[in-house]
């Protein structure tokens, strides 16, 4: 009898301890922002993201910043603990030799040990938000490119996906069409495609301010589920392209979007203060964490006639 009671106690203690490892089943969603290098203003991006998520109230946010020097020892010591989180927001971008420090090129990729940990995290069920220019990153890292699906690449690098005027997806093979690019930033009419949980309850279309629409994003393009699309502003082109999509990798979920352009010198840009963006980010994180998508659709969510830009993001500065 004593042994049986002891066994019951051990089972209860183990059950209580299990949520501490891997994904949490209740409580706040644990989010890790990974930053440290980009051609965009990664420092301000992190501050703005933290401000949005802390205001939402259901996220526990941490940050892991890549070393700010080129010493091998510093990089060897950098090892983000991905497994301790439900979702990783990846903001790093090494595209175009964007150095960590001024004048330092080429920009580094993550160390092999960090890459391995990241792949294992997603494969086992972790969620990843590929934030804006992180879609450009890590040319040649096969697993990362599979997760992202569509990246900033040359014309012959992979398949592109565009959307027809009737809302049908059209796959463009390598070498057909152009390399990835974008026209001038502008107020963009975003249209939903389908009825994904992230967009449930949202209008079918809305205006998003100061936005880039990437054309001819390319990659493996496997398991890509396009959630929303918009027309690019490139003169003489004006086709429809994905601006939000999801993929899967192993048991993990991945969400990619071009929302959130924060250029160097921008302060509290409209791209981040958009009511649509500040609604969709928490909803995407809920979905990535495997939770029900319950974050409310904002009363000031924009329609098709005007953008909806909020005041300064709280707690960010």
Task: Label each residue range with its predicted role.
Residues 20-22:
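Boundary at the C-terminal end of the N-terminal hydrophobic targeting segment
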Residues 1-8:
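Bacterial N-terminal signal peptides that target proteins for export
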Residues 8-17:
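Bacterial N-terminal signal peptides
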Residues 28-138:
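Helical hinge/lid and interdomain linker segments adjacent to catalytic or ligand-binding clefts
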Residues 50, 119, 145, 199, ...:
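Non-transmembrane alpha-helical segments in soluble domains
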Residues 38-39, 94-96, 135-137, 204, ...:
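Short, solvent-exposed loop/turn segments at secondary-structure junctions
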Residues 130-234, 297-317:
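An acidic, glycine-rich "communication" segment
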């Amino acid at each position: 009898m004593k042994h049986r009671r002891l066994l019951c106690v051990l089972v209860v203690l183990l059950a209580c301890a299990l949520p501490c490892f891997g994904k949490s089943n209740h409580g706040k969603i644990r989010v890790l922002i990974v930053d440290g290098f980009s051609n965009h203003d990664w420092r301000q991006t992190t501050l703005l993201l933290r401000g949005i998520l802390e205001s939402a109230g259901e996220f526990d946010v941490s940050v892991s910043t890549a070393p700010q020097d080129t010493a091998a020892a510093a990089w060897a010591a950098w090892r983000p603990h991905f497994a301790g989180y439900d979702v990783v927001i990846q903001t790093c971008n090494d595209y175009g030799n964007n150095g960590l420090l001024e004048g330092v090129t080429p920009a580094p990729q993550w160390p092999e040990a960090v890459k391995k940990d990241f792949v294992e995290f997603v494969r086992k069920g972790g969620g990843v938000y590929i934030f804006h220019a992180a879609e450009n990153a890590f040319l040649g890292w096969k697993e990362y490119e599979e997760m992202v699906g569509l990246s900033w690449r040359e014309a012959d690098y992979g398949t592109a996906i565009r959307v027809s005027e009737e809302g049908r997806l059209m796959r463009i093979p390598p070498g057909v069409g152009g390399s990835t690019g974008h026209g001038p930033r502008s107020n963009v009419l975003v249209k939903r495609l389908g009825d994904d949980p992230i967009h449930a309850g949202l209008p079918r279309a809305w205006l998003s301010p100061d936005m880039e629409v990437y054309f001819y994003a390319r990659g493996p393009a496997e398991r890509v589920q396009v959630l929303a699309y918009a027309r690019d502003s490139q003169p003489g082109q004006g086709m429809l392209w994905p601006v939000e999509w999801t993929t899967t990798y192993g048991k993990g979920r991945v969400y990619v979007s071009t929302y959130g352009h924060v250029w160097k010198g921008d302060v509290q840009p409209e791209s981040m203060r958009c009511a649509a963006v500040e609604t969709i980010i928490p909803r995407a994180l809920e979905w990535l964490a495997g939770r029900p998508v319950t974050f409310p659709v904002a009363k000031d969510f924009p329609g098709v006639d005007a953008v909806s830009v909020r005041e300064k993001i709280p707690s960010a500065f």
